[in-house]
């Protein structure tokens, strides 16, 4: 059987998990005080789709826009380690690479903190041109 070639186009981001426990309420405000025990980072958004496709044995290419920051480098490092092909990942210095941080205490999500750019992307024509050059190399395209 031949390997499926999938092209994933979408928002790459980091999912950051902060795991801890809570045994008291803050005296400053009625909120839980979380004692951090562990932290982990993995691909989120379209990156989660990429990771799942790779785990199923597909060959995966990626088209996306990231910020020009350390988080983008972390996303690219994880993609490389997983074996994804960087077809077209544009670094935009005006954008923040998205990070979704979730604080977990006693197996419950306490809060999610989003750090991201929500403005429309400015490099649409570059993405469309890049897509036009490579889409025929893939069996399936996921948006």
Please tell me what each predicted stretch does.
Residues 9, 63-65, 104:
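Short hydrophobic segments within beta-strands
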Residues 1-23:
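Positively charged, low-complexity intrinsically disordered leader regions
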Residues 89-95, 102-135:
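Conserved phosphate-binding/catalytic loop of the ribokinase/pfkB sugar-kinase fold
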Residues 14-22, 71-76, 99-103, 115:
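Short acidic, glycine/serine/threonine-rich loops at helix termini
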Residues 138-143:
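Short acidic, glycine-rich surface-loop motifs adjacent to enzyme active sites
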Residues 27, 32-99:
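Substrate-binding N-lobe of the ribokinase-like
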Residues 1, 135-136:
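A short, aliphatic-rich alpha-helical micro-motif
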């Amino acid at each position: 059987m031949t390997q499926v070639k999938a092209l994933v186009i979408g928002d790459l981001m980091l999912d950051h998990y902060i795991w801890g426990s809570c045994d008291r309420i803050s005296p400053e405000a009625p909120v839980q005080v979380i004692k951090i025990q562990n932290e982990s980072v993995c691909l989120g958004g379209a990156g989660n789709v990429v990771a799942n496709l790779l785990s199923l044995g597909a060959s995966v290419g990626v088209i996306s826009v990231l910020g020009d920051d350390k988080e983008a480098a972390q996303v690219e490092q994880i993609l490389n380690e997983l074996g994804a092909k960087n077809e077209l990942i544009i670094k935009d210095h005006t954008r923040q690479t998205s990070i979704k941080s979730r604080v977990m205490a006693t197996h419950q999500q306490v809060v999610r903190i989003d750090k991201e750019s929500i403005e429309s992307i400015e490099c649409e024509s570059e993405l469309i041109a890049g897509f036009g050059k490579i889409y025929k190399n893939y069996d399936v395209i996921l948006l």
